[in-house]
């Protein structure tokens, strides 16, 4: 599937026990990660294999309806407005004509060394002299609603475009056997999501709790969920949310053991932070940050 949003490991339990087992295995065995930069908007660009033409666009290039693929400035004028249109014009003028399809996060226009495209502020060690700055992270072989994305993209800089290396993260040796065993023991008793309650409903509920800074405990998540939805028809139970919380803890343990090799400083609310410097002193805030930066 196109990388329209990041799938979070803890959400795997909402897709079934087998998917959750695969996510747990990935968390405890992964050695290399792709760092998700906090850029906006997402830019998709490359050569369309169907006609051989270079294009730029947003994630709307993967739409099932109202597909917005831009080959010219006129296409951009027709499909987009405002800041997004301005960014796409810069992208069309300055991106290299490559024979691949790449998704990247927009960081900004060159000429400076401090950028805050979204929540996280980035300080580069020196001024970026290229025209535009992007953080490429996913590649595709086609433009289709069901295109499969592949992480691990590293593009060479050009005269006009500065590409951030999003592959500069490795995992130190770590383990959490007790937490893994506890989570696996809960899986057979975790309720399955039924047809009367969509995955999107549960994701919205959990994301709302994270944004509000609520304490992420299984019982509290379940109680507030039952207050909104019919508990007899939603399928999920206390063990579902216990597994969700445990997998999120595993993810945070992994985040604690990530080492990056870049030299870009990161700031949130004016305070220095980085993957290797995030601690669990504020677990809810950390989980929000983890949602922003974590890719297997």
What name fits each language-model region?
Residues 278-296:
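Single conserved hydrophobic/aromatic residue that forms the stacking wall/gate
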Residues 48-49, 292:
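Residue-level detector of alpha-helical segments with a strong bias toward transmembrane helices
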């Amino acid at each position: 599937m196109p990388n329209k949003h990041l799938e979070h490991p803890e959400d795997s339990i909402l897709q079934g026990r087998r998917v959750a087992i695969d996510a747990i295995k990935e968390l405890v065995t992964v050695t290399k990660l792709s760092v998700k930069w906090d850029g906006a908007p997402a830019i998709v660009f490359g050569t369309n294999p169907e006609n051989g033409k270079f294009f730029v666009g947003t994630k709307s290039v993967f739409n099932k309806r109202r597909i917005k693929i831009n080959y010219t400035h006129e296409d951009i004028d027709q499909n987009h407005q405002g800041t997004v249109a301005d960014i796409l014009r810069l992208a069309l003028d300055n991106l290299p004509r490559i024979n691949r399809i790449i998704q990247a996060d927009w960081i900004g226009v060159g000429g400076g060394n401090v950028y805050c495209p979204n929540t996280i502020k980035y300080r580069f060690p020196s001024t970026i002299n290229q025209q535009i700055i992007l953080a490429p992270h996913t590649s595709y072989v086609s433009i289709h609603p069901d295109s499969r994305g592949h992480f691990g993209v590293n593009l060479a800089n050009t005269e006009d475009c500065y590409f951030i290396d999003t592959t500069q993260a490795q995992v130190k040796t770590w383990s959490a056997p007790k937490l893994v065993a506890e989570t696996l023991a809960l899986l057979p008793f975790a309720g399955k999501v039924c047809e009367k309650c969509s995955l999107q409903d549960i994701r919205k509920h959990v994301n709302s709790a994270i944004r509000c800074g609520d304490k992420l405990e299984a019982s509290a998540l379940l109680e507030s969920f039952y207050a909104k939805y019919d508990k007899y028809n939603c399928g999920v139970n206390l063990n579902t949310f216990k597994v969700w919380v445990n997998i999120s803890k595993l993810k945070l343990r992994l985040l604690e053991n990530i080492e990056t090799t870049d030299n870009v400083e990161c700031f949130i609310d004016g305070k220095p932070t980085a993957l290797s410097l995030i601690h669990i002193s504020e677990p809810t805030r950390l989980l929000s940050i983890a949602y922003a930066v974590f890719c297997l």
